[in-house]
A protein has these predicted regions:
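Cell-envelope/extracellular polymer assembly enzymes that use nucleotide-activated donors
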Residues: 3-5, 29
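Short, well-formed alpha-helical segments that are part of the catalytic scaffolds
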Residues: 7-26
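Acidic helix N-cap motif at the loop->helix transition within catalytic regions
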Residues: 15-18, 39-48, 89
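A conserved acidic beta->alpha catalytic loop
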Residues: 23, 34-44, 57, 81
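Short, structured coil segments at secondary-structure junctions
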Residues: 26, 48-49, 128
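Conserved donor nucleotide-binding strand/loop of the catalytic core
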Residues: 42-71
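Catalytic-site signature of metal-activated, phosphate-bearing donor transferases
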Residues: 63, 69, 87-185
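Short aromatic/hydrophobic "clamp" motif used to bind/position activated sugar donors
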Residues: 77
Length: 185
C-alpha cells in the first residue's frame, strides 16, 4: 500500500494550522518545517503529533521546502502552504492516485480555490498547482513562487476539466486588510 507524507513549511502560522492539519489527519506522516515561529505554531503541530523540524529563515520558502521534503519517508509527498486546506474529496482522490498512478505520471497539479478577504475569487482559479508527487521526483529551484521541477516522467493535471466536485485545495489567502498590512512589513 502506497504511503503519503504531507510537508508543510511554517512561519507564525497559527491562524489556520489546526484546520490545515485536521484536513490531512489521515496522512501516514505529517512534517512541519518551521522557520522559528514566535506564535503558537509549534504547540499546534505538537497537538497533531507532527514531526517537527526547524530551518533557518532564508527569505524564500523554496530552500526550506527542499530540505523538508528530504525528511519525508513515505512513497508520495503532498506539499501544502500553512493556509491551504485539503478537501475530503481531494484527500480521497490523492489516496487512490497513490495506489494506482497513471503510467509515467509522477507529479500532479491540483486545482486550488482561493479566498481573499473571506470571499471566493473565481477569476483566480488555477488549472492547477504542482503539489503532489512521488518522493524524490520533484524539487524547487531557488526562485520564489516557481513551480517545482519534475525529475522523471510527466505531470498530470487532477480534475483539469472541473468535473470532479470539491477535488481542490482551498487557499485562505489574506483574510483581512490588517493581515495584508502585516505581510507587507
Amino acid at each position: 500500500m502506497a504511503t503519503i507524507s504531507v510537508v508543510i513549511n511554517t512561519l507564525n502560522a497559527q491562524r489556520l494550522l489546526d484546520d490545515v492539519l485536521e484536513s490531512v489527519k489521515e496522512a501516514d506522516e505529517i512534517i512541519v518545517c518551521d522557520m522559528h515561529s514566535e506564535d503558537e505554531t509549534i504547540e499546534i503541530a505538537k497537538r497533531h503529533k507532527c514531526k517537527i523540524f526547524y530551518h533557518e529563515r532564508t527569505g524564500i520558502v523554496e530552500l526550506a521546502r527542499n530540505w523538508a521534503m528530504e525528511q519525508a519517508t513515505c512513497d508520495w509527498i503532498l506539499v501544502l502552504d500553512a493556509d491551504e486546506i485539503v478537501t475530503p474529496e481531494l484527500w480521497q482522490y490523492l489516496k487512490n492516485y497513490a495506489q494506482h498512478p497513471k503510467k509515467n505520471r509522477n507529479a500532479c497539479y491540483i486545482p486550488r480555490e482561493t479566498y481573499l478577504l473571506g470571499k471566493h475569487v473565481h477569476s483566480w482559479r488555477q488549472s492547477g498547482i504542482k503539489r503532489f508527487w512521488k518522493r524524490g521526483n520533484c524539487y524547487y529551484t531557488n526562485e520564489i513562487h516557481k513551480m517545482p521541477v519534475t525529475r522523471e516522467g510527466k505531470d498530470f493535471w487532477i480534475n483539469k476539466n472541473g468535473k470532479l466536485k470539491n477535488v481542490a485545495l482551498i487557499h485562505y489567502h489574506i483574510p483581512s486588510l490588517n493581515h495584508f498590512g502585516v505581510r507587507l512589513n
